[in-house]
Curated annotation (Swiss-Prot):
<keyword id="KW-0873">Pyrrolidone carboxylic acid</keyword>
<feature type="glycosylation site" description="O-linked (HexNAc...) threonine">
    <location>
        <position position="100"/>
    </location>
</feature>
<keyword id="KW-0193">Cuticle</keyword>
<feature type="domain" description="Chitin-binding type R&amp;R">
    <location>
        <begin position="32"/>
        <end position="102"/>
    </location>
</feature>
<comment type="function">
    <text>Component of the abdominal endocuticle.</text>
</comment>
<feature type="glycosylation site" description="O-linked (HexNAc...) threonine">
    <location>
        <position position="11"/>
    </location>
</feature>
<dbReference type="GO" id="GO:0062129">
    <property type="term" value="C:chitin-based extracellular matrix"/>
</dbReference>
<dbReference type="InterPro" id="IPR031311">
    <property type="entry name" value="CHIT_BIND_RR_consensus"/>
</dbReference>
<dbReference type="Pfam" id="PF00379">
    <property type="entry name" value="Chitin_bind_4"/>
</dbReference>
<dbReference type="InterPro" id="IPR000618">
    <property type="entry name" value="Insect_cuticle"/>
</dbReference>
<protein>
    <recommendedName>
        <fullName>Endocuticle structural glycoprotein SgAbd-2</fullName>
    </recommendedName>
</protein>
<feature type="modified residue" description="Pyrrolidone carboxylic acid">
    <location>
        <position position="1"/>
    </location>
</feature>
<dbReference type="GO" id="GO:0008010">
    <property type="term" value="F:structural constituent of chitin-based larval cuticle"/>
</dbReference>
<keyword id="KW-0325">Glycoprotein</keyword>
<dbReference type="InterPro" id="IPR050468">
    <property type="entry name" value="Cuticle_Struct_Prot"/>
</dbReference>
Length: 135
């Protein structure tokens, strides 16, 4: 019925992967909401994290505080290690592999210091002519 029009399409089969053993695993969740977990795998991946609720019951002050680390080996063989904190001040990560901003040029740094020391005047909008304004 389909004649020469039907041709089976090639299918993709992902390569078989070796299963990676879990060498260590722990997960602790406490009644107060605090927790801690860690794991280590046979291929060199490791992670740990702990967290707790800061100021529980205080609606505007509650904040989840979390800190942890993880590490692995990149495909090029580079060891990657990351340490992080997440709290009311946001997420902050540290690691040798993370890019860092270039230093601020000295002239700009001096300008920023002058701006910080100069008292700011309150903004006073100036009246402007508007020919389309209707009275």
């Amino acid at each position: 019925q389909f004649g020469n029009y039907y041709q089976p399409q090639p299918t993709y089969s992902p390569p078989a992967r070796q299963q990676v053993p879990i060498l260590q695993y722990s997960n602790e969740v406490n009644p107060d909401g605090s927790y801690a977990y860690s794991y280590q795998t046979g291929n060199g991946i490791a992670a740990q994290e702990q967290g707790y609720l800061k100021n529980p019951g205080q609606r505007d002050l509650e904040a989840e505080n979390v800190q942890g680390t993880f590490s692995y080996t990149a495909p090029d063989g580079t060891p990657i290690s990351l340490r992080y904190v997440a709290d009311e001040n946001g997420f902050r990560a540290e690691g040798a592999h993370l890019p860092t901003p270039p230093p601020i040029p000295e002239a700009i740094a001096r300008s920023l210091e002058v701006i910080a020391r100069t008292p700011q005047q309150p903004f006073q909008p100036q009246p402007q002519y508007n020919p389309f304004r209707r009275f």
